């Protein structure tokens, strides 16, 4: 948010207009990312109060995948042309024991064979899933050697053998396996 207080603070700088332009360009880019990950429809008039993640501005990347390629969405079922999203349970008694297994299965089963070995594939994931995976490593007393090993594992941020990437405004409990230049 570009407040009056911030404008007043910046007014004394030679690059005042550049700072304003940069703030506007950054906000526009973040809004495009927010729409890309959260957009589900295009409303005639957007309502920011009801759709704080800009869900009604336009269809985003994830929604287009749900609609145009439902067979590439894990947990979804299509019957008579209607696709229903389903939950994928991870953990004891769930569909998968851990997130690594989810990613490996998704790469093997949901991604076309010609793209499965692409070295540029990454897992774009929500903050909560990344935290669920790595929090148990840091939430305990450890010897120095174990702490160093945990730090190394966390710094690599991998899921199912792919680089894990956090993106702003990505849904908290979702995964997207793609190339970053595909977005």
Task: Describe the residue ranges of each PLM region.
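Beta-sheet entry/capping signal
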Residues: 120-122, 174
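C-terminal structured domain segments
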Residues: 157-183
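Flexible, glycine/threonine- and acidic-rich loop/arm segments that mediate assembly and lattice contacts
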Residues: 1-120, 127-146, 151-153, 169
């Amino acid at each position: 948010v570009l407040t009056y207080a911030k404008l007043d603070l910046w007014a004394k700088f030679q690059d005042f207009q550049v700072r304003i332009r940069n703030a506007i360009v950054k906000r526009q880019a973040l809004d495009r990312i927010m729409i890309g990950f959260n957009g589900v429809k295009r409303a005639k008039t957007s309502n920011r109060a009801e759709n704080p993640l800009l869900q009604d501005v336009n269809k985003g990347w994830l929604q287009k995948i749900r609609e145009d390629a439902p067979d590439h969405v894990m947990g979804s079922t299509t019957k008579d042309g209607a696709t229903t999203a389903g939950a994928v349970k991870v953990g004891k008694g769930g569909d998968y024991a851990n997130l690594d297994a989810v990613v490996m299965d998704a790469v093997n089963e949901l991604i076309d064979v010609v793209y499965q070995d692409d070295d540029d594939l990454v897992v774009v994931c929500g903050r909560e899933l990344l935290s669920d995976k790595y929090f148990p490593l840091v939430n305990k007393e450890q010897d120095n050697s174990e702490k160093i090993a945990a730090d190394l594992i966390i710094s690599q941020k991998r899921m199912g053998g792919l680089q894990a990437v956090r993106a702003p405004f990505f849904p908290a409990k979702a995964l997207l396996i793609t190339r970053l230049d595909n977005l």
